Amino acid sequence: MKGFVASVVLLACGALAADIVEPEDCTSFPCMIFEDNFDYLDNDIWEHEITMSGGGNWEFQAYVNNRSISYTRDSTLFIKPDLTSNWKGEDFLSSGTLDLWGMNGRGDVCTGNSYYGCSRVGSSSNIINPVTSARLRTMSNFAFRYGRLEVRAKMPRGDWLWPAIWMLPRNWPYGLWPASGEIDILESRGNDDFGTLGNQYGGTTLHWGPFWPYNFFEKTHAEYSANTGSFADDFHVWRLDWTKDNMEFYVDDVLQLTVDPGTSFWDFAGMGPFFDNPWAAGAKMAPFDQKFYLILNVAVGGTNGFFPDGIASKPWSNLSPTAFLDFWNARDEWLPSWKAGEDRISEGAAMQVDYVRVWKMESTEQ
């Protein structure tokens, strides 16, 4: 049994809930303010996003709330994608209407209507999202500013899977994306054979800029490889050390990226006097001087270029108007990598999370 901090709620079944401590209640430091060891899926902490919006990337999955897809076992969270046809039948993809609007509140109601995210009608050339998966967030229940975050996780193995551990601003105080920032602690790909972009590799990125399309993520991005094998072979620990002066990102205690903007991110970007600075009233780390919440998800495919054209045997083009259909028609090529010799999709195709922990390191302000 894993260790737990004090004041964790003991449930009748013997499982322990995620624990949250208000930073102002810390009396010594480091002070753990969040811990989830996933003895069970705590829906009071983790909210399922319900949407087909594809993250603005025209990804191929629909995010749903289903215990065949997101579940816990042996103190581990699994996010394991499935085929929409296993839920609705193959004919539904090209002739059905998938309505995610819901009516019963959190966990049932659509959370993202952009990009036709709440309702879609399938046709022969424009099919409904062929995959279902899960995206969990702590937006309503836990967010933090400054401290240490650790996530111990194992990445999925399977062609065109796109796992991510990341953070978004709770209140978007500097405006719409990317003005209020995005913290991508890890993004990876499930492919065994995808050149230098397969599951042996991961990436860490900050997205920031005054407004789209000005996004200076290239200045705050690092790519790295697993010490041995791939990130789908075993568990690894991703860590963020976040202070009012800088950010440091580690994998298995090895520093991968340091972000120190100097005087400000505005000066770091070199924007000059021709634009208004949305972070002028913020601290040095603005837009990363505010509370962010946690997100865990497994996406699939997409046309934004995360899976570039011209590498391996990618079955769709990022410019194709029928990318969903092209991907689905090639399922005999990619689905075996998800099943790994089993009759159904293997748990090897799941992102597995052992724990998530957050500390305040020096004071409530650091």
Curated annotation (Swiss-Prot):
Domain GH16: 18-364
Glycosylation site positions: N66
SUPFAM superfamilies assigned to the protein according to its UniProt record, in alphabetical order: Concanavalin A-like lectins/glucanases (SSF49899)
Induction: Not induced by injection with the beta-1,3-glucan curdlan or the shrimp pathogen V.harveyi.
Primary residence: secreted
InterPro entries for the chain: ConA-like_dom_sf, GH16, Glycosyl_Hydrlase_16
Annotated Gene Ontology cellular component terms: extracellular region
Entry's family note: Belongs to the glycosyl hydrolase 16 family.
Name of the molecule in the record: Beta-1,3-glucan-binding protein
Organism: Penaeus monodon
Species classification: Eukaryota, Metazoa, Ecdysozoa, Arthropoda, Crustacea
